[in-house]
Amino acid sequence: MERAAPSRRVPLPLLLLGGLALLAAGVDADVLLEACCADGHRMATHQKDCSLPYATESKECRMVQEQCCHSQLEELHCATGISLANEQDRCATPHGDNASLEATFVKRCCHCCLLGRAAQAQGQSCEYSLMVGYQCGQVFQACCVKSQETGDLDVGGLQETDKIIEVEEEQEDPYLNDRCRGGGPCKQQCRDTGDEVVCSCFVGYQLLSDGVSCEDVNECITGSHSCRLGESCINTVGSFRCQRDSSCGTGYELTEDNSCKDIDECESGIHNCLPDFICQNTLGSFRCRPKLQCKSGFIQDALGNCIDINECLSISAPCPIGHTCINTEGSYTCQKNVPNCGRGYHLNEEGTRCVDVDECAPPAEPCGKGHRCVNSPGSFRCECKTGYYFDGISRMCVDVNECQRYPGRLCGHKCENTLGSYLCSCSVGFRLSVDGRSCEDINECSSSPCSQECANVYGSYQCYCRRGYQLSDVDGVTCEDIDECALPTGGHICSYRCINIPGSFQCSCPSSGYRLAPNGRNCQDIDECVTGIHNCSINETCFNIQGGFRCLAFECPENYRRSAATLQQEKTDTVRCIKSCRPNDVTCVFDPVHTISHTVISLPTFREFTRPEEIIFLRAITPPHPASQANIIFDITEGNLRDSFDIIKRYMDGMTVGVVRQVRPIVGPFHAVLKLEMNYVVGGVVSHRNVVNVHIFVSEYWF
């Protein structure tokens, strides 16, 4: 039975003891279980050890203290595991990878948190479906949600890339808000449905009207007991027991432990054996065994007298066949019978009866060739053998050609006539069945005729090969390796280089700057700047490019200073310089160039073009076409080798955007610096100019 409990917050230690509080009821009313639980929490928090002795004489209080201490320790260890996953991104505990209880809980929560972070990184849902347990599922969901981030990158007053950085939002851990955590407000069992907390009771208890407490069910009154007929039901706390209320029956007596014990009538002297008999006890009764033993051929009657046994009646077939049994005092004799036989019969070997003479038995041939002798009681007759018929003209038995007389009805495949019979045979790929007429398919695959896989078909078999192999055109049974790298699609199997191996293939990547992706086919760029394997000096900035890295040092020109937004960053793809004129420097003040930025972009080799490739976005800080607003003009002033790039103006999300596009293929390795200008023109005069130097590195590979 379940009822919804009042939706109210209860201190966590009391939730953990919803079931344990029942143990104390009626045992020691002076013991305050809440205080015992608080002691257990303090021991876990300060001592980190639940095995220390508890200063109490109450068994129930010690049980509560131990359970609350272990519960608090589990929460502390789980919080440590979540911190390891978020801060170190690995689950190596300070105590090493041991099998202690602390390390087990720390590692479990750490692994569950890493799974949640990995699910978010792979774009999967944070609503977990793995059967990993309730606590692990809550940690999984919390870490998955917390690892989402948002953000954006500005280049001066522009936004020169379309990268998005997500700002982490603080979310409350749903596991900490579980109202059934530790037992909830319920005294025995608790279930949080989301809308409310539902309490229920153990077997043998029922829920009270307060929806929280439980009371014992009297099964003896409600009739829910299982006592059998002849037993009385006695109620106990949470259950019941059955007690026998009738006697055990004749020959048994009831013991103190409600069981039946055999009565030894011989020892107690309550038997009725006569003086010439000895009493022998049995289970539930007794037996009277006579003292006098009779000789062979005699049996004792009820009074102990020896009387003769008639073996001719009591024994089944006491004499051999052909003999008659005659009873004697204490024994019997057998007398032989001598019968007289007529014509066509003779006495059997035992001489007991007459049997038929088989005139047809070899080597006698009373009927001659082509005929069959048929014996009959006291005589015989001659007829044609099976497979022959009697020719009235020649007066002889002639062979029957069954194959011609019954075409297609005798054999499954082929029929061959023989003298007096016929033989059936089968085509290739079949064998004769047990009936000698039907043909059944031969499973040629049982003899392994193929080099790899074999499929039995009706009357034959077919060889086929495993993945990565093909059947030989020469013998049709040998499997030859398929060179996947030489197939028309082989160039697209691997992103760099394909290596054929027996039954499969392997992909490889350039010797440096790349590693093979988990799918075993694509090559992934190694970010040397992130992994720390670059050799850039302290005055240089490491920029990752496809297949390598570059160490670059950008200095602001005279009358310009480094932007504070990029000055404090340890790693960025953009360096921005803002104009900072000295006092009374009129030339500097009237110079329209306000910002000079350097940014780095890495591109693969585009060997074929179907449409221009958009690579850089310059976003203006003012909305398009406001009243009395400057006209924004984008231009490439330097570094556009062979006009491989162009820039167009576009309006996106209410902003004016300059889009740099690659319009011609470039085969790497290639390095160029594009100088981009964004001019604010008012009345035909440039009032404001931002300069962006884009360092373009083109890889020699297309990936």
From Swiss-Prot:
State the encoding gene: FBLN1
Highest taxon, organism lineage: Eukaryota
Q: Which residues form the signal peptide?
A: 1-29
Q: Which InterPro entries match?
A: Anaphylatoxin/fibulin (IPR000020), cEGF (IPR026823), EGF-like_Ca-bd_dom (IPR001881), EGF-like_dom (IPR000742), EGF-type_Asp/Asn_hydroxyl_site (IPR000152), EGF_Ca-bd_CS (IPR018097), Fibulin-1 (IPR017048), Fibulin_C (IPR055088)
SMART domains, per this entry?
Answer: ANATO, EGF, EGF_CA
TM region positions: none
List GO terms (cellular component aspect). Answer: basement membrane; collagen-containing extracellular matrix; elastic fiber; extracellular exosome; extracellular matrix; extracellular region; extracellular space
Under the heading Gene3D superfamilies, the entry gives: Laminin (2.10.25.10)
Q: Which organism is it from?
A: Homo sapiens
Similarity remark: Belongs to the fibulin family.
Name of the protein in its database record: Fibulin-1
